């Protein structure tokens, strides 16, 4: 259902307020670059520091600006099941085509708790839903066996697998078959994960290089394996640079350096250190981004 190069879009701020004009411009930059779908209010969109009104407004702006040209997949995850249901329902009402739900963080549920959480949302809201497994951030790993149980529900259509583990992604693919799509959640392994059977990537790098990320994915699905492999290697350095500090600090810094929006992040995220910013500038110059 959702495939290809999918951007986890940044939320631009201006003096502490969501910059709606710049957000619309960033959406246009993505569509012009061949991006296949857009995720507002994900990790990269600083969803955890948006208030409810801002969260809904960001989704609304992206849905309006996209105007059905590509799917919009709203980040609606929470560590409260009731809140996740409410946010997913709001996203549906705002016109989102799907929802991306991170595993409940901090409270460290068991696999049974994770299963019941996702099933509760899937039962409550008739909207295509993508599981989001990122244990490095959440403190809990959604295991392949649990994914296989969840894949039986018609509203659970995909998983963003961001463990960085090809083994775990492969186990999900082996257990679930065609009952659920796998999307890569780590830019630096998009190509090998697609080789295992993933249908695309939810990308951070696409915020600054949408054409190139789309070129990698498009080459792969066109059967041009050598071209895709070359894109994988070309993009490796910038992919790594996007994570030299906590996401989305590097990518927002990059967006700022390119003059596309402010590099402003919200506390407790802090501006990039000078040392890392200099490293990022050096890499971006190699790619002729600045």
Curated annotation (Swiss-Prot):
Site (Part of a proton relay during catalysis): 43, 106
The protein's enzyme class: lyase
Catalysed reactions, semicolon-separated: L-aspartate 4-semialdehyde + pyruvate = (2S,4S)-4-hydroxy-2,3,4,5-tetrahydrodipicolinate + H2O + H(+)
Pfam families, alphabetized: DHDPS
GO molecular function per UniProt: 4-hydroxy-tetrahydrodipicolinate synthase activity
Gene3D superfamilies for the chain: Aldolase class I
Residues given in the record as pyruvate binding sites: 44, 202
InterPro entries, per database record: Aldolase_TIM (IPR013785), DapA (IPR005263), DapA-like (IPR002220), Schiff_base-form_aldolases_AS (IPR020625), Schiff_base-form_aldolases_CS (IPR020624)
Annotated Gene Ontology cellular component terms: cytosol
Single GO BP term: lysine biosynthetic process via diaminopimelate
Major subcellular location class: cytoplasm
Pathway(s) annotated for this protein in UniProt: Amino-acid biosynthesis; L-lysine biosynthesis via DAP pathway; (S)-tetrahydrodipicolinate from L-aspartate: step 3/4
The protein's Enzyme Commission number: 4.3.3.7
Keywords: Amino-acid biosynthesis, Cytoplasm, Diaminopimelate biosynthesis, Lyase, Lysine biosynthesis, Schiff base
Family according to the record: Belongs to the DapA family.
Subunit and partners: Homotetramer; dimer of dimers.
Protein name listed in UniProt: 4-hydroxy-tetrahydrodipicolinate synthase
Annotated source species: Geotalea daltonii (strain DSM 22248 / JCM 15807 / FRC-32)
